[in-house]
Amino acid sequence: ECARLHCCFLKDIAGEFRKTPADIFVFFTPEGKKERLVRLLGEDLRYFAQEGKDLGERMGNAVKKVLGLGYDACVLTGSDIPELRAETLKLAFRVLECKDVVLGPTADGGYYLIGMKRPHMGVFEGKAYGTGSVFQDTEAAAKQEGLSLGYTEMLTDMDSVSDLNGYRARMKEREELRRSATGRYLARTVPISVIIPVYNEAETIERLQEQLFP
């Protein structure tokens, strides 16, 4: 179920990128998963295996790879941000027209988006990824290198059951979430509970259990 949900995240994110004029690159791990990703996301994207010993190095190398292909700017996003929208991506590129680095913060103290015009590898190095200080530490590293910073809106990455429950709650108010691949999947997997009042009906309960759990 977790894998299917993450596939929905990827579909939604790729769909939003396709609404922008940007070329799309997918950096994946482990090696050997390219064919599955192509089936999921399409052949029009470009796929590269991730390189590096840790998350920071892999992200830095991905940005360096894309900029090395001759692009003026690169925006890197996480793969667990189903509420990411094309407008946010377009804003990130606009920010890079006047700033060296753009960051998109998450509610838990991390970031879901980072973009730059040159591969500033020091921004990625030595960070405790997965902790609540990543955004602050990355911001400090960029400033220490004398880089100017801009920002996009804060979003929630899907790291826990409470994050998913928050997404479900927002689905009630936002039609675009209900229509997304993630929203449709969550709508099909809503947990239900049934309360059956009984009194001294052991045999009835046993028969009911047999029907529910054959």
Residue ranges and their predicted role:
Residues L84-D108:
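Conserved donor-nucleotide/metal-binding helix-loop-beta segment in metal-dependent transferases, i.e.
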Residues D54, T88, F93-V95, R188-P214:
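Structured catalytic core of nucleotide-sugar glycosyltransferases
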Residues H120-A141:
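Short, glycine-/small-residue-rich phosphate/pyrophosphate-handling segment
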Residues R39-A73:
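Short phosphate-binding loop-to-helix
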Residues D137-T189:
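Conserved alpha/beta core of the MobA/IspD/sugar-nucleotide pyrophosphorylase nucleotidyltransferase superfamily
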Residues E1-R18, E201-P214:
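Short, well-formed alpha-helical segments that are part of the catalytic scaffolds
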Residues D23-R46, Q209-P214:
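Acidic donor-binding segment of Leloir-type glycosyltransferases
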Residues V75-T77:
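Short aromatic-hydrophobic micro-motifs that form the base-stacking/packing surface
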